Amino acid sequence: MQDPERFATTRRGALKLVLAGLASAGLVKSATPALADTLGDIKARGELVAATEMQFPPFDMSDNGVYKGVDRELIDAVAKELGVKVSYLDLPWTSVLPGLEAKKFDLVIAPVTITKERLKRYAFTVPIADATAALMKRADDKSIAKPEDIAGKTVGGQKGTSQLAQLKEFAAKLPKPVEVKEYVDNNQSYADLAAGRIDASVNSLPNLAYAAAQRPDAFAVVLPAFGQPTYFSWVGRLDDQSLIDAVNAALVKLDGDGTMAKIQKEWFGQSINLPTTVPEPKI
């Protein structure tokens, strides 16, 4: 007895060949648009257009107009593997993912936390860094020794981030209400923290560790981190899997040849072991 599924597949394949022949002869028009070939387009023009928010040190920052950070060095190395150049776009964080969906650029290289909801909408690369949510306080504040000590206090964070969402969930379980202030970017939150207008800032542990290392007289990280273990990745569109596969292959190669560790040590002060596949998110 013939396998119905195999037979249907064979028939579909034959039909595609017939339609392809008719289309090449100009006898029929395509009923549906061709699948996206962003990787092919990138290689044809010799340029990858990548977007981020250059207000997220140590991953992305603008130093007197010069783009620097973990993502800059990583994407340059990836582009070299792909044989193309990179064009960088600096956008507000709240415009980055909508811009990707609107096809205004090829890839998001801003660190995006892998979450269950985002996995439904975007294609993620393998992780590039830890994204676990943590808190930072003023260095001289003795009233906060652990995350639970923010009960009854004011904490700031960047609007639209998973770290802010995790803060709200964490705060809801504390005995006293926490006032949560939302900011356009983390630098504004840090400025208000230093000025005493808020009591703590939320961000990923690597971001906070970097900020505290830059200003040890002003800031201190509150340990342990309170969030679920999570990771940052780059993001593409769901129909651009060939691009994501190529980027992943490059990232895995850079991890294997020591390039990833070198970049991590430069910006984080240490190398970090990361998964070489996209992990199942816990949030």
Model-inferred region functions:
Residues 94-95, 112-120, 166-171, 194, ...:
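A ligand-binding cleft/hinge motif common to bilobed small-molecule-binding domains
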Residues 162-180, 220-221, 252-283:
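Ligand-binding clefts/hinges and TM-proximal coupling segments of bilobed small-molecule sensing domains
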Residues 37-111:
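Extracytoplasmic small-molecule ligand-binding "clamshell" domains
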Residues 54, 129-137, 209-248, 270-283:
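Periplasmic-binding protein-like
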Residues 73-81, 141, 148, 153-154, ...:
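Extended ligand-binding regions for polar small-molecule ligands
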Residues 61-62, 75-84, 163-182, 212-216:
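Ligand-binding cleft/hinge of the Venus flytrap
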Residues 1-27:
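N-terminal secretory signal peptides
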